[in-house]
Regions:
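Extracytoplasmic gate region of multi-pass secondary transporters
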Residues: 31-68
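Helix-to-loop junctions at the C-terminal end of transmembrane segments
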Residues: 78-91, 177
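Structural signature of the two symmetry-related core transmembrane helices
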Residues: 94-109
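Intracellular juxtamembrane helix-capping segments at the cytosolic ends
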Residues: 132-146
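A late C-terminal transmembrane helix in Major Facilitator Superfamily
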Residues: 149-177
Length: 177
């Protein structure tokens, strides 16, 4: 994946001076960005880390588990452009909240009702398609409130929060399973 970037004749973009930003300041600027990234890290790690375990416990074959997990990535690939397009034209906060509500509803339906495998694959595509772009939406939303020189520092803080949330996703999901 890095080869095209490394071989491109274009120089890396020049950044003006960057400034650090504390977690307290970052949270005061964008509580949605901070809390969203923490939750997104937990949800991503639970989804992608435990989906195959859930599939095995549910009696899916190895091939079905592979298709199920792969469908989440395909959904992210397919829906990232329409969601990005919508993000550039609507209130990002409302888009993040709306997509999160749809994802929660889809997860709830999937958890409560036994689904045929083909429907399960569709659900996985929808969940992957919605949850993967939320990561980028949260960064973009936070950056909307920052001066350019604080964006890199804020991104570092958001990535840290995402990673911190990722620690608890598979563990808490494993306990619930």
């Amino acid at each position: 994946a890095f080869m095209p970037l490394l071989l491109a004749p274009t120089p890396a973009p020049a950044f003006d001076s960057t400034r650090r930003i504390s977690f307290a300041r970052l949270f005061s600027i964008s509580p949605l960005g901070c809390i969203g990234m923490l939750l997104t890290g937990g949800i991503f790690s639970a989804m992608f880390g435990m989906a195959s375990v859930w599939g095995a416990q549910s009696g899916l074959s190895l091939a079905q588990i592979s298709i199920f997990v792969g469908a989440m990535y395909v959904g992210g690939l397919v829906l990232q452009y329409p969601i990005g397009w919508a993000s550039d034209r609507t209130d990002r906060r409302k888009l993040i909240m709306g997509l999160s509500a749809v994802a929660a509803l889809v997860m709830l339906v999937a958890a409560l009702a036994p689904l045929p495998f083909t429907v399960l694959v569709g659900v996985a595509m929808i969940l992957g398609g919605i949850t993967n772009p939320i990561y980028s939406l949260l960064i973009a939303y936070t950056n909307d409130f920052l001066p350019r020189e604080q964006m890199a520092g804020a991104s570092a803080g958001l990535i840290f929060l995402n990673g911190f949330g990722a620690i608890f996703g598979p563990t808490s999901t494993g306990w619930m399973m």
